[in-house]
């Protein structure tokens, strides 16, 4: 019924013969927002990303819903907070098949949907989950010739060209370009290629303050940065292909990354898999020549959960009630910079599992606004390794609080400083309120499904991610 209503909405949204907009969704793997020079910290030469930002809007506060690829990518598809995706809130879990996903809704309305590279996941396509073809027709045939060590080898841009040649030019399209770079491992000599191909020397490489400044760390960072630069060349080629096909003006180009940079500090996760900004704050820029004013910087806090409602509304389709994200179309249509929607003044993210075995836990929630960040970490088992009951699973294992104005890297925990008690309580109350309203099991105490899913993904990992009838969910 919802889909029918959406189709009825669609027919009234566009004049006869008017083409609905296309979408090119370009997603890298493991890249914090500051990696891009457009944000003012690095010296990374990524001209294609910069072009999209200059001809569209650069989002200063774009966030993944989780610092982990599986749950973050699931939110792009479902338009929901990661904790609302049930088994899909865990890497190596699955998105329940009854949950509407944006690519299937677009396809049902006449969009041609395709992808290259990494789609949703890694995860399971159990009988209870969405099918493996939910991102449309796969284009993976084209490969790079003699790619440098560490690069995946997929020629993403050439595969996009194949998609453009395959599609019906009279119909709109949605294409998911899942670039696997800059995910580790990286090539041992790619720091040399960074200077040779992109002109970036080791002394120009930006290092976070929690990373020791050594020659080895600079080389490691340079090898990582090289892959970002290589990814940008594919974006450049795709933009040129859109122009050649006459589709650039009518295409919303969205460029982002699924979670933050994979980086450690004294063995502790500070980026990917962490609740800090370097884990969930991602690059995000959008360009739509026919529909957006160029040259804008937007400070609204936006989430991956907002993307699916945006794509649907832009296509003239009804947004299902299941999608709790809010469409960004009013922001895209605005001519202003800065804070466009006053209520977008904070963001809440979190994580349940990123491949660890009990008793190690990376389960967390984080809420932040323009000034402060409040972090809660949770345990999942007791000291004897026994699973905690629901009430205990709601209780914080550790609380952290940061003044982002004075400490943007979140290194000085002020949770016990009485001067910040009121601000800490304000964000804690806001986290509980949003968690209760949105059904976060860590707030409501309804942790049975999450406990079972944690057992499921841990067992899948021990079994090498092979299907088995002995797993907690029917495969």
Predicted regions and their residues:
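Extracellular, beta-strand-rich glycan-interacting domains
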Residues: 404-406
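Sec-dependent signal peptide recognition
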Residues: 1-6
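Formylglycine-dependent sulfatase
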Residues: 12-399, 408-429, 436, 442-443, ...
């Amino acid at each position: 019924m919802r889909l029918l209503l959406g189709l009825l909405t669609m027919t009234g949204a566009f004049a006869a013969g008017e083409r609905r907009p296309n979408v090119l969704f370009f997603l890298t793997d493991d890249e914090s927002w500051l990696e891009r020079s457009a944000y003012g910290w690095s010296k990374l030469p990524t001209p294609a990303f910069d072009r999209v930002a200059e001809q569209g809007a650069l989002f200063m506060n774009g966030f993944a819903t989780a610092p982990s690829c599986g749950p973050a990518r699931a939110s792009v598809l479902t338009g929901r907070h990661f904790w609302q995706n049930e088994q899909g809130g865990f890497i190596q879990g699955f998105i329940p098949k009854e949950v509407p996903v944006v690519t299937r809704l677009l396809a049902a309305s006449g969009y041609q949907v395709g992808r290259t590279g990494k789609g949703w996941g890694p995860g399971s396509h159990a009988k209870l989950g969405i099918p493996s073809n939910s991102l449309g027709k796969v284009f993976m045939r084209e490969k790079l010739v003699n790619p440098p060590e560490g690069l995946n080898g997929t020629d993403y841009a050439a595969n996009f060209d194949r998609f453009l040649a395959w599609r019906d030019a009279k119909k709109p399209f949605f294409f998911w370009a899942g670039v696997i770079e800059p995910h580790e491992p990286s090539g041992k000599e790619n720091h040399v290629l960074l200077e040779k191909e992109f002109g970036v020397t080791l002394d120009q490489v930006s290092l976070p303050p929690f990373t020791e400044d050594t020659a080895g760390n600079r080389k490691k960072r340079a090898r990582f940065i090289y892959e970002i630069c290589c990814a940008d060349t594919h974006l450049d080629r795709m933009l040129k292909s859109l122009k050649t096909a006459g589709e650039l003006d009518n295409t919303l180009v969205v460029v982002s990354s699924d979670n933050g940079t994979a980086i450690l500090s004294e063995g502790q996760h500070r980026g990917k898999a962490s609740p800090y900004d370097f884990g969930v704050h991602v690059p995000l820029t959008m360009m739509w020549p026919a529909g957006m004013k160029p040259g804008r910087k937007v400070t609204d806090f936006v989430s991956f959960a907002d993307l699916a409602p945006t794509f649907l509304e832009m296509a003239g389709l009804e947004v299902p009630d299941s999608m709790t994200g809010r469409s960004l179309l009013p922001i895209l249509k605005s001519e202003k910079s800065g804070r466009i929607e006053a209520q977008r003044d904070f963001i809440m993210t979190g994580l349940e599992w990123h491949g660890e075995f009990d008793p190690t836990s990376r389960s967390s929630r984080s809420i932040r606004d323009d000034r402060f960040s409040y972090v809660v970490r949770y345990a999942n088992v007791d000291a004897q390794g026994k699973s905690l009951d629901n009430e205990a699973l709601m209780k914080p294992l550790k609380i952290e609080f940061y003044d982002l104005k004075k400490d943007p890297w979140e290194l000085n925990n002020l949770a016990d400083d009485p001067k910040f008690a009121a601000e800490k309580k304000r964000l804690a109350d806001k986290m509980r309120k949003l968690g209760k309203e949105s059904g976060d099991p860590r707030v409501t105490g309804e942790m049975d499904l999450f406990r079972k899913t944690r057992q499921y993904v841990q067992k899948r990992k021990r079994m090498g991610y092979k299907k088995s009838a002995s797993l907690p969910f029917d495969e």
